[in-house]
Swiss-Prot record:
Active site: E138 (proton donor/acceptor)
Record-given protein name: dCTP deaminase
Nucleotide-binding recorded as keyword: yes
Family of the protein in this entry: Belongs to the dCTP deaminase family.
Residues the entry annotates as binding dCTP: R110, S111, S112, L113, A114, R115, D128, V136, L137, E138, Y171, K178, Q182
Keyword Coiled coil: no
Region (Disordered): 168-193
Amino acid sequence: MRLCDRDIIKWLDEGKLVIAPRPPIERINGATADVRLGNQFRVFCGHTAAYIDLSGPKDEVSAALDRVMSDEIILPDDEVFFLHPGELALAVTLESVTLPDDLVGWLDGRSSLARLGLMVHVTAHRIDPGWHGQIVLEFYNSGKLPLALRPGMVIGALSFEPLSGSADRPYNRRQDAKYKNQQGAVSSRIDED
């Protein structure tokens, strides 16, 4: 059963759930808390690679990822990021989120943005128990027009679901956690699998 707005506020007040900066009360509604777009992005660079062999040797996968991903792009607050039709880009939430070991989070994009073709997460919308860090957004523009995205705009909403008990292996205590304490638009670390 997901937390209602009253319980999200209670968990925030008690410090069991942390969203920093904390959303104002008008951004916690029904069963969600809104999150905003940060100012860090990554895009795919122009490249001539025919493919990336994701099951190849780790060093080759790592080198291929380095060739196709841009360095982190940090926008000033007054600039916009343009996402063109058919483009995939990584971005990050302005907020950092910390979940306890007995709570899982879910990120959903906004319906109003989806109706313009913007996918906020391609597939990865679960936020594991024990998570701490910013949330990377996998943007895809499936629409017909470029979309101007501004840092600080409301980009999605988080909902939270209590578990039947505390996880034995929460994200923050896993040795193989590739995105622990994530800050910024971190690109794929598939080569660390």
